[in-house]
Amino acid sequence: MSHIKFGTSGWRGIFCEEFTLDNVRVVVQAIADHLHAEGLAEKGVVIGYDARFMGGDFSRETARILAGVGIKSYFCQRDTPTPVIAHELLRRKAAGAINFTASHNPYNYSGIKFSPVSGGPALPETTNDIEKRANAMLGEIVYKEISLENAAQQGLYEEIDPREAYFTTLKKLVDFKAIAVSGMTIAVNPLYGSGRGYLDRILEEAGVKVVKINDHLDPYFGGKPPEPAEEYIEDFIGLIKSDESVVLGLATDGDADRFGIIDSDGTYIEPNYILALLFDYMIRRKGLRGDAARSVATSHLVDAVAEYHGVKVLETPVGFKFIGEYISADKILIGGEESAGLSIKGHVPEKDGILACLLVAEMVAVEKKSLRELLSDLYSRVGEIHTKRINIHLSPQLEAALPDKFANPPEKIGEQQIVEVIQIDGNKYLLEDGSWLLFRKSGTEPVVRLYAETKNFESLATLIDLGREFILG
């Protein structure tokens, strides 16, 4: 039996290796025990799954196990996006949600994501308890289950369709009339994932012309990771370049919690820029007011927007769970990460790629400009900022030397004085000219993730080289 370990987005593993039916049963029982210990079991649990192999089978087994210990399941009838599951959890005031997803990981992975009563990703104190309970049970038959038929008769199993309630919320947050009146054609790419029938349907119902690609169920995700990053959506970019009628391309990942945005000429727009553009748009055009939250790895272009509008930015460790806390507490207008996660005030404290895409569509429709033009306009007001991330692979010797290297940082990086060291997640060095470097060690492989940001594009490569030299030198 392999050790159960929860990461930033739950427990994930490769099919038939770590992710087995026996291990799933143990984790589900651990969640059930956790809910009983917290006195929440009577509120019931929302169960959902993405488009991967056996998602429905694992979910039904989960419902049988929960019923065996008296916990009701609200079972999503088809593969369902993560933000929709979070929305349903909050709407029903359930005890939590169990979501079978590995998000943007390749097809041979699966996972369990547990969301507590707050609706956001579980915080470490919750996942640590579940993890401890699960590992104590490995190899033991500790669960009992009852059939779904008997569970339904006892009021412990109910099949649900959460889509319409979610759509109702989106219609309060997004100006669909503005999108429709613009007359623009939008290309939509759910990457064969659980976002099928969401972006396309709600836009079409609003009267928007939609061009679809990769919109049928495929557990192999077309042979690529279901991640809407530039390198995995060449076909989508090609479609937009070849169809002059398309003004905007909107993509979501395997469970639709992340987004990918393509401009009218086929240019991929980095999530860092989308977050800053939407923050500016919500204040300047929608007349809203509030602070932003971003992870330590996310661009300070968000900070420049905040300074321009006289509001603040809250910096968090990597992981949307920390941003979700601010959304739950109604402390921010928008929160996001450079890894394409975003949500806003009044919505779920969970990444929502569907909402992010729709807000971008609204922004383009209202502003009547391309995203490249909008970014240029933003730069003219707050200044240019350029960001890049690379991975640095380590030898065993270099990996062993890292703790001492970070414990004794240099006074300078190149010719720039280090003015502040931030260690809430990794080691971030703020430099005197406003540029910065962040080093984050992977928890699963001998890799350091290097993030670099400068105020002009020409110096970005130099700063990356200096960061690489610091690690490898």
Positions of the model-derived regions?
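An N-terminal, well-structured beta->alpha segment
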Residues: M1-V69, A95, A151-M184
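Buried hydrophobic positions in well-ordered alpha/beta secondary-structure cores of metabolic enzymes
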Residues: S9, I47, I85, I98, ...
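Short glycine-rich phosphate-binding loop at a beta-alpha junction
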Residues: A41-D50, T185-V188, G290-V296, L333
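Proline/glycine-rich low-complexity loops and linkers
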Residues: Q77, K132-A165, S264-G336, L342-I344
